[in-house]
């Protein structure tokens, strides 16, 4: 049996720069079909206009609604082949700037999505007055949260709060979309050690590596596997996409 955990170990020894460039090109090639897609109404609300973080945000993102729509289409182009695919309906995205702890989080449901972005995090990210660094971080965080709005979810295994596999898939895919679109600082942002069950960047870099080295459609197929492998599991999805000779255990 080919063991995916051995492939993952090899991944940790390989530089990821070429990986990110390759995946970004594939997403760019697929982007045009999403230009007219209805991403849902974008409602931007600044709940902390008195903060320095708010002032900084408006300077780097002068048209938040258009910017959010652009990044939403990037997410869609990464997760799906075309608007004809089975895509969760998103009617509205209420995006807020808030003077609270944390970084950013997605909430809501049934097509009404909420996302907050912390002005405190903006201020911390701008501590060195590095506009480019803050813009890079803001885009990366947004890609992650928008993925939660449009991604498919595992079926037959519980929920985000009750099942670790469900959680690892959801957070791993969100960071995979961020990795795939150059939203992290290349190999420097890749965690050392760990495995796919750690979710977030550890899983995200692994999923993108599988796309680059095993199947160029891996991210889209992995997302779609939640509809085709029920009850869903990492091992079942890997076999479904790459073949029965592969195992993740």
Feature map (PLM): residue ranges:
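Short pre-active-site segment immediately N-terminal to the catalytic Zn-binding motif
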Residues: 121-142, 157-166
């Amino acid at each position: 049996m080919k063991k995916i955990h051995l492939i993952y170990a090899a991944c940790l020894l390989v530089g990821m720069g070429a990986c990110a460039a390759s995946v970004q090109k594939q997403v760019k090639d697929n982007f045009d079909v999403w230009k007219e897609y209805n991403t849902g109404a974008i409602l931007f609300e600044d709940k902390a206009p008195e903060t320095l973080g708010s002032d900084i945000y408006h300077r780097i993102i002068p048209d938040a609604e258009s910017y959010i729509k652009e990044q939403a289409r990037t997410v869609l182009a990464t997760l799906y082949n075309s608007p004809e695919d089975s895509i969760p309906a998103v009617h509205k995205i209420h995006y807020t700037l808030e003077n609270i702890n944390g970084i950013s989080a997605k909430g809501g449901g049934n097509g009404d999505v909420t996302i907050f972005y912390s002005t405190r995090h903006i201020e911390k990210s701008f501590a060195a007055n590095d506009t480019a660094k803050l813009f890079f971080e803001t885009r990366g965080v947004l890609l992650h949260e928008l993925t939660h709005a449009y991604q498919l979810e595992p079926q037959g295994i519980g929920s985000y709060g009750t099942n670790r596999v469900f959680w690892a898939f959801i957070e791993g895919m969100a960071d995979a979309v961020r990795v795939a679109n150059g939203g992290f600082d290349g190999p420097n942002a890749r965690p050392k050690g760990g495995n796919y069950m750690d979710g977030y960047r550890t899983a995200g870099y692994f999923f993108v590596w599988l796309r680059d080295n095993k199947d160029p459609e891996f991210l889209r197929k992995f997302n779609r596997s939640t509809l085709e492998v029920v009850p869903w599991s990492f091992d079942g999805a890997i076999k479904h996409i790459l073949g029965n000779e592969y195992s993740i255990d």
